[in-house]
Amino acid sequence: MDFAGRVVCRDVFEYPYPDPRTLFPALESKLARVNQALGANASKVVGVGVAAPLWLGGWRDFLGAPPDALDAWHEIDLRSRIATMTGLPVEFAKDTTAACAAELVMGQGRGIHNFLYLFVGTFIGGGLVIDGRLHGGPHDNAGAVGSIPLRDGGARKPARQLLHAASGFVLERLLSDAGKPAAAAHDHRALSPEMWRHTEEWLDTACPAIANALTSAAALLDLEAVVIDGELDRQMVREIIRRTERVLDRFEWEGMVRPQLLEGAIGADARAMGGAILPLYAHFAPVHELFLKPATEAAY
């Protein structure tokens, strides 16, 4: 991404779970292709931004990954590994915090100054903006909405945390169990008549769970808005907002200010674009700590 926020080059590597034995060779290969595509402009690259979960070795039961693949992350310094690979400075942020940074700089954040950000990817996660600044907190984990405990899991079965009810992987499994392609959870096919029954089953659990989490957040944070985005079809994002608003209509708001729900402006690439912002702010922003993780390393 260039200084004006334009995406210069884009590539994708899909994997069922983050296995460093396959991820790093693929990443090295793709970075080499990017450098080749940039040609003479490769020398102008100021750094690499990494947007990744803080705990890459977690939630193995849901990813279906072998223990040895995820355990390896506990011994890996991701920032150092990529710096060695590229020879460039590396900046790091939690993936959904990076997505929130993109929304703050290039999306709804240009008009609102206090908002909670939700991103529905494989897992649901988020970020937090207070007084126009990205707020990470002492552990750089503010806005970890996926870990909010739930009072109940909606219509079907109990869920321990919001991520068990409202994450994309839940819809992926519903589709897969029905003999449908799991990847359809993240595009227009999820809204097709053929798959709508499974999508609606997910929405019936996800939206009440999101609404419950948002009431707690609104009471604690006094928000202007909640911005919802995801690695989803845009109509699906709007359907989540519509159904969540319907649930919120039934809640008692006395003593609280109900935040407006807004559709994110960036979309599926928010995490990657937020990551790409990080080196630019490290070099050019007057107070780049507002956007970047401190030097202390995350636990993978």
What are these regions (language model features)?
Residues 3, 44-160, 274, 278-297:
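Phosphate-binding/catalytic loop of phosphoryl-transfer enzymes
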Residues 1-44, 84-86, 152-300:
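ATP-binding/phosphotransfer module of carbohydrate and carboxylate kinases, centering on a glycine-rich
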